[in-house]
């Protein structure tokens, strides 16, 4: 595990310890029961049958790039990207490293009809009910950050709340772990966790090793329709795109160009 990822996970655990409580979880349970999740995996699969399924990511900043978008109006961006054809949204909720928030997730979820992914470092079941309470329809589980037992337990907890799980891998060994655990929505992150270098060839190197039932998602480093076409030729069904959209003067115009 890279030192950067370890530092982020340590911060996440400290934050969880500071705000986790039985009363807070009970309140989230109540709020979670008020909403019916929108099918995240189904939305991606259906859009992929008709065109290009893009998960548009609302990301203000990152540890490697610093501030990405200064004019970060979550409601306006969510509306704009849905209207431009996004199949789903990914909303960063990590505060210290990505300048995200659960409130941003809630605002986006209440604004759009497409499903929303909570993009964060999920380590504890308490974060899952919290995600549902704030309107998430899916969560991200990062194989590099979790043991196989953690992955199973957190996936089961997500299912309890009707949430889909995007299982994120970075290399061949992590893909095998995800496949052996039976995940059916697997994303390959093209960002090297040690160097932070991004290379979409990472998604192509082991494309043939996916389990047959898994819907494939390519994440990071996608900047053009040519990138998408190459990945589609390798049987990728969906594409998580953040920085290209967030740096654009017109995210909607950029998304339309990518979708074609």
Swiss-Prot record:
EC number: 4.1.1.48
PROSITE patterns: IGPS
The protein's enzyme class: lyase
Any Pfam family hit: IGPS
Statement: the UniProt record of this protein carries the keyword Ribosomal protein: no
Transmembrane segments: none
Residue ranges that the Swiss-Prot or TrEMBL entry lists as coiled coil: none
Gene Ontology BP terms: L-tryptophan biosynthetic process
Keywords noted in UniProt: Amino-acid biosynthesis, Aromatic amino acid biosynthesis, Decarboxylase, Lyase, Tryptophan biosynthesis
InterPro entries noted in UniProt: Aldolase_TIM (IPR013785), Indole-3-glycerol_P_synth (IPR045186), Indole-3-glycerol_P_synth_dom (IPR013798), Indole-3-GlycerolPSynthase_CS (IPR001468), RibuloseP-bd_barrel (IPR011060)
Catalytic activity: 1-(2-carboxyphenylamino)-1-deoxy-D-ribulose 5-phosphate + H(+) = (1S,2R)-1-C-(indol-3-yl)glycerol 3-phosphate + CO2 + H2O
GO function terms (MF aspect): indole-3-glycerol-phosphate synthase activity; phosphoribosylanthranilate isomerase activity
Family annotation (HAMAP family): IGPS_A, IGPS_B
Family note: Belongs to the TrpC family.
Name of the protein described by the UniProt record: Indole-3-glycerol phosphate synthase
């Amino acid at each position: 595990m890279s030192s950067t990822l370890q530092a982020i996970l340590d911060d996440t655990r400290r934050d969880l310890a500071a705000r986790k409580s039985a009363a807070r979880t009970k309140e989230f349970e109540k709020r979670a029961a008020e909403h019916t999740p929108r099918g995240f995996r189904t939305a991606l699969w259906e859009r992929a049958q008709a065109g290009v399924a893009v998960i548009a990511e609302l990301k203000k900043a990152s540890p490697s790039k610093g501030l990405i978008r200064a004019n970060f109006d979550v409601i306006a961006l969510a509306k704009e990207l849905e209207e431009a054809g996004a199949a789903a949204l990914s909303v960063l909720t990590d505060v210290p490293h990505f300048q995200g928030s659960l409130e941003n997730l809630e605002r986006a979820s209440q604004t759009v009809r497409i499903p929303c992914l909570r993009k964060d470092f999920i380590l504890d079941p308490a974060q899952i009910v919290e995600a549902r309470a704030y309107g998430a329809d899916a969560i991200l589980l990062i194989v590099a950050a979790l043991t196989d037992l953690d992955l199973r337990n957190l996936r089961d907890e997500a299912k309890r709340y009707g949430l889909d799980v995007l299982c994120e891998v970075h290399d061949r060994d992590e893909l095998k772990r995800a496949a052996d655990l039976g995940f059916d929505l697997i994303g390959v992150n093209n960002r090297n966790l040690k160097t932070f270098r991004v290379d979409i060839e990472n998604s192509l190197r082991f494309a043939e090793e996916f389990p047959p039932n898994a819907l494939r998602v390519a994440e990071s480093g996608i900047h053009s329709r040519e990138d998408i076409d190459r990945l589609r030729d390798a049987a990728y069904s969906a594409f998580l795109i953040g920085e290209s959209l967030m740096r654009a003067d017109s995210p909607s115009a950029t998304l339309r160009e990518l979708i074609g």
